[in-house]
C-alpha cells in the first residue's frame, strides 16, 4: 500500500480519501488543515501517551514485587494500602467540588432510562439502536420470555391467548405507572380529550380521569377520538396507540392497538470493545457509519418476507398539546454517544514521522470531533444534540492523570476544529481498578466535561485479576459477583457521583445485561440498577431497552438519589481493596468445569473475531445459553486461566486438552454458519492459536488486555485471505 504523505504523517489512502471526500466537506474544515492539526496533536501528545502506558507497566511491576515479597504471609490490608499510596497508585482524595458540565442534553442531565451499546461496524444494528428511543411494549412482551411461553401458544401467526396475556400485563403496567382516579385501564372503553384533560370512559358506564392529570402530555388525531394518547411518568413517555381497525385494536374495548415506550434514551456508538477494527479499511467503515448517523444519511437495506426494506433514522415524534392548540415534539432517536479507543491502542491507519503506528485514541478523538460538526452545524435533517455538545465515551483509563490527558486531547481537538471550549464531553468508564480507587479525583479532573460515569463489571474484574496476579489463585469466575469488592465498587461509583454533583450534569450508569434471551430474569434483576441510584444502565438490544424502561417507571431515580445523598456514602475503600483470592482446594471436577467453561467461552468468541471480524455477538455458552460477548468477557476468562496457571492450580496440558475438546463443541454450535471455519481436528488455525496466546501469554499482556493478540492475529487471518 502506497501511503499519502501529509505533514509528516503517512496516511492509508482509504482514510485520506474518506476525510477529503466524505467527512470534511460541509464542516468548514479543509482536509489539509485537519491533517496538519492531527500531525501536531500526535507529535505533541504521542510521547505523553506512551509515558502514561509506561507508568501503568511500572506500577504493575511494583505491585507484583510487593505480592511476591509478602507471599506466605497473612494479607495486611493496612500495609497494602500504605504501599499503594507510596508508589502513587492511590492518590490523595481531593476536597469535594461539584462538577460544572454545561450544555448537556436532557438525555444526559435529566431523563433516566436505558442505554444501548452498538458496534459501529454494522450499519443496520446502529440504525436499530438509534431508532430504539421508542419500542413496542406489546411486541417486547409477546416475543420474549417476559411472559412465560406456553407450548400451546407456539406456531406461526398471532396467538390470541398469548396476546391476551400481553395486553393484560401491559395494562397492569399502565395502572401502576399512570393510574386512573378510579378503575383500571383494563376496563376502559374510550379515551378522549375534553377541555385539555384526558377523559376516560369505563365499561361500567362511569367516567373517570387520570389520578394525576399532569401525566397527560398530548395526543394525536381528533380530541373526541384520538389515534394516540401521550402519557408521562418519571420523565419517560408512553404512547397509547388507538386503532379500532387494527388486528389488535379491533378486539380491545378502548381500541388500544399498542403501547409504545420511550426506551433507549441514549446509545453508545462503539468504536472499541464490540468491534474488530484492525486496519484502515475497518476504521473507515466505523467512521463512515458514524458520519451517516451524524449527518442523517445512513441507511441499510435488508430482506424481510421476500422484500427488500430500507432502514434509516426515524424522524421526531409530533403530538398536539393537551389543549389541542400547540405542538409537542419529542426526540425520535436515542441520543448518540461515541466510544473511542483507549489510550493503550495503536493503529496503522496512520504512521507518524518515525514510521510507527499512532495512538488510536488520538485519531479517534480528532475524527469524532470532525464528524460531530455535521450535527453541530445542522447538516442533518435530524438533530442529535440540541445543546451544541458532542459526547465521547473514553474507556480503560487508569487514574486521574489519564483523565487529565483525555481532557487535554479534547482541548486540542476543539482548538484544531474551531469548536467552543468544552464542546466535547467525556464519559468516564469506571472499569479499571486505579480509576475506581481514585474516582473522586478522576471526576474532578474532568469537572467541566464529564457527562457520565459508568461501572463496567466485566472489564473491572479482568483488571482486578491481572493487578493481583501474584497475590494467589483467584476464586471461581461465577463467584466473583458475590464478593465484597464488587458491591463496594458499584456503590462507590454512585456515592462519588452524588458527592460530586453529577445529577443534572451527567449520567451515573450501570453495566450490561448479557443474556438477551433471558428477559424474565432481566425484569426480575435489573430493577436493582435504578434502585441503586443509577440514571442509566446497559442493555443488549432494542427489545431489552423497551423492557428495562419499565424499571424507570417503577423507580423515581431522582428521588432515590436524594434519599441516597441524605443517607451518606455506603462503600468503603477497604472493601474495594480486598483481593478476591481463594484458599480453597477445589475438587478435580470443579477445576475441570472451570477450565472448560472458560475455554469454551474464549473459543466461541475468538473464532468469530479472528475469522469473521465480528467483535460482538451472541455466543452460546457451555450450556447453549446465548450470551452477548465482547472483549471484556474475553479479558476475564483469559486472565482467570492465566492466574490459575501461574498459581499452579492447573497445568498447560489440562488447558490444552480442554481447548481441543471445547473446539469440537464450538464447531458444533456454529454448524449452521456457512462461512464458519472449523477449528477441529487440526487445531492449527489462526483463531485457535489466538485463543492459546490469550491464555498462555495472558500474564504478560499489559493490564490483561486482549486487544494486542486479537489485532495481530486478525491481521494475520486477513492477510491469509
UniProtKB/Swiss-Prot annotation:
Disulfide bonds: none
Top-rank taxon, per record: Bacteria
Subcellular location: Cytoplasm
Biochemical pathway: Carbohydrate metabolism; glyoxylate cycle; (S)-malate from isocitrate: step 2/2
Residues the entry annotates as binding acetyl-CoA: 117, 124-125, 274, 311, 540
The entry's keywords: Cytoplasm, Glyoxylate bypass, Magnesium, Metal-binding, Oxidation, Transferase, Tricarboxylic acid cycle
Gene Ontology molecular-function annotations: magnesium ion binding; malate synthase activity
Similarity comment: family membership: Belongs to the malate synthase family. GlcB subfamily.
Function: Involved in the glycolate utilization. Catalyzes the condensation and subsequent hydrolysis of acetyl-coenzyme A (acetyl-CoA) and glyoxylate to form malate and CoA.
Name of this chain's protein: Malate synthase G
Organism of derivation: Bradyrhizobium diazoefficiens (strain JCM 10833 / BCRC 13528 / IAM 13628 / NBRC 14792 / USDA 110)
Gene name of this polypeptide: glcB
Amino acid at each position: 500500500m502506497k501511503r499519502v504523505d501529509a505533514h509528516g504523517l503517512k496516511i492509508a489512502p482509504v482514510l485520506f480519501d474518506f476525510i477529503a471526500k466524505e467527512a470534511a466537506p460541509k464542516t468548514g474544515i479543509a482536509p489539509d488543515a485537519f491533517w496538519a492539526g492531527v500531525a501536531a496533536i500526535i507529535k505533541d501528545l504521542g510521547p505523553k501517551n506512551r509515558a502514561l502506558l509506561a507508568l501503568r507497566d511500572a506500577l504493575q511491576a511494583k505491585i507484583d514485587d510487593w505480592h511476591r515479597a509478602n507471599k506466605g504471609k497473612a494479607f495486611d490490608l493496612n500495609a497494602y494500602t500504605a504501599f499503594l499510596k507510596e508508589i502513587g497508585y492511590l492518590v490523595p482524595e481531593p476536597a469535594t467540588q461539584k462538577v460544572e458540565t454545561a450544555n448537556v442534553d436532557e438525555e444526559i442531565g435529566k431523563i433516566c432510562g436505558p442505554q444501548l451499546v452498538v458496534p459501529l461496524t454494522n450499519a443496520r444494528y446502529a440504525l436499530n439502536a438509534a431508532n430504539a428511543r421508542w419500542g413496542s411494549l406489546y411486541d417486547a412482551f409477546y416475543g420474549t420470555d417476559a411472559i412465560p411461553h406456553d407450548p400451546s401458544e407456539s406456531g406461526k401467526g398471532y396467538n390470541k391467548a398469548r396476546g391476551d396475556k400481553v395486553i393484560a400485563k401491559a395494562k397492569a403496567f399502565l395502572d401502576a405507572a399512570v393510574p386512573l382516579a378510579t378503575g383500571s385501564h383494563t376496563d376502559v372503553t374510550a379515551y378522549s380529550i375534553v377541555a385539555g384533560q384526558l377523559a376516560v370512559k369505563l365499561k361500567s358506564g362511569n367516567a373517570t380521569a387520570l389520578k394525576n392529570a399532569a401525566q397527560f402530555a398530548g395526543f394525536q388525531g381528533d380530541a373526541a377520538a384520538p389515534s394516540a394518547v401521550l402519557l408521562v411518568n418519571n420523565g419517560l413517555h408512553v404512547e397509547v396507540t388507538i386503532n379500532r381497525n387494527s388486528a389488535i385494536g379491533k378486539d380491545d374495548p378502548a381500541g388500544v392497538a399498542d403501547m409504545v415506550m420511550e426506551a433507549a434514551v441514549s446509545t453508545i456508538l462503539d468504536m472499541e470493545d464490540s468491534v474488530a477494527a484492525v486496519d484502515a479499511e475497518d476504521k473507515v467503515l466505523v467512521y463512515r457509519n458514524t458520519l451517516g448517523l451524524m449527518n442523517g444519511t445512513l441507511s441499510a437495506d435488508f430482506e424481510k418476507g421476500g422484500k427488500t426494506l430500507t432502514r434509516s433514522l426515524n424522524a421526531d415524534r409530533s403530538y398536539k398539546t393537551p389543549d389541542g392548540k400547540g405542538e409537542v415534539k419529542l426526540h425520535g432517536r436515542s441520543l448518540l454517544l461515541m466510544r473511542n479507543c483507549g489510550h493503550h491502542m495503536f493503529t496503522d491507519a496512520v504512521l507518524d514521522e518515525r514510521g510507527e503506528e499512532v495512538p488510536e485514541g488520538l485519531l479517534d478523538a480528532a475524527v469524532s470531533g470532525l464528524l460531530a460538526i455535521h450535527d453541530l452545524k445542522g447538516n442533518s435533517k435530524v438533530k442529535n444534540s440540541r445543546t451544541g455538545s458532542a459526547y465521547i465515551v473514553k474507556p480503560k483509563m487508569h487514574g486521574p492523570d489519564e483523565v487529565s490527558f483525555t481532557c487535554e486531547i479534547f482541548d486540542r481537538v476543539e482548538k484544531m476544529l474551531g469548536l467552543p471550549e468544552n464542546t466535547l464531553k467525556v464519559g468516564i468508564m469506571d472499569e479499571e481498578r486505579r480509576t475506581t480507587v481514585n474516582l473522586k479525583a478522576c471526576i474532578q479532573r474532568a469537572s467541566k466535561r464529564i457527562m457520565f460515569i459508568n461501572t463496567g463489571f466485566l472489564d473491572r474484574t479482568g483488571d482486578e485479576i491481572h493487578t493481583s496476579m501474584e497475590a494467589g489463585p483467584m476464586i471461581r469466575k461465577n463467584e466473583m459477583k458475590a464478593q465484597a469488592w464488587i458491591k463496594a465498587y458499584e456503590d462507590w461509583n454512585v456515592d462519588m457521583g452524588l458527592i460530586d454533583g453529577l445529577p443534572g450534569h451527567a449520567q451515573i450508569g450501570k453495566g450490561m445485561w448479557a443474556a438477551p434471551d433471558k428477559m424474565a430474569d432481566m425484569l426480575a434483576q435489573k430493577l436493582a440498577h435504578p434502585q441503586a441510584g443509577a440514571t442509566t444502565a446497559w442493555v443488549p438490544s432494542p427489545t431489552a431497552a423497551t423492557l428495562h424502561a419499565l424499571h424507570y417507571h417503577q423507580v423515581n431515580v431522582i428521588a432515590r438519589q436524594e434519599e441516597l445523598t441524605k443517607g451518606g456514602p455506603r462503600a468503603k475503600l477497604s472493601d474495594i481493596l480486598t483481593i478476591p483470592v481463594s484458599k480453597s482446594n477445589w475438587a478435580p471436577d470443579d477445576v475441570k468445569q472451570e477450565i472448560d467453561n472458560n475455554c469454551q467461552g474464549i473459543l466461541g468468541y475468538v473464532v468469530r473475531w479472528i475469522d469473521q471480524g465480528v467483535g460482538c455477538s451472541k455466543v452460546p455458552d457451555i450450556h447453549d445459553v446465548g450470551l452477548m460477548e465482547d472483549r471484556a468477557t474475553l479479558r476475564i476468562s483469559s486472565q482467570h486461566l492465566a492466574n490459575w496457571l501461574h498459581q499452579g492450580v492447573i497445568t498447560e496440558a489440562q488447558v490444552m486438552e480442554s481447548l481441543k475438546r471445547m473446539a469440537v463443541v464450538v464447531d458444533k454450535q456454529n454448524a449452521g454458519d456457512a462461512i464458519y471455519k472449523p477449528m477441529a481436528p487440526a487445531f492449527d488455525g489462526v483463531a485457535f492459536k489466538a485463543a492459546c496466546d490469550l491464555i498462555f501469554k495472558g500474564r504478560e499482556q499489559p493490564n490483561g488486555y486482549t486487544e494486542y493478540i486479537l489485532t495481530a492475529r486478525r491481521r494475520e487471518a486477513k492477510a491469509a485471505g
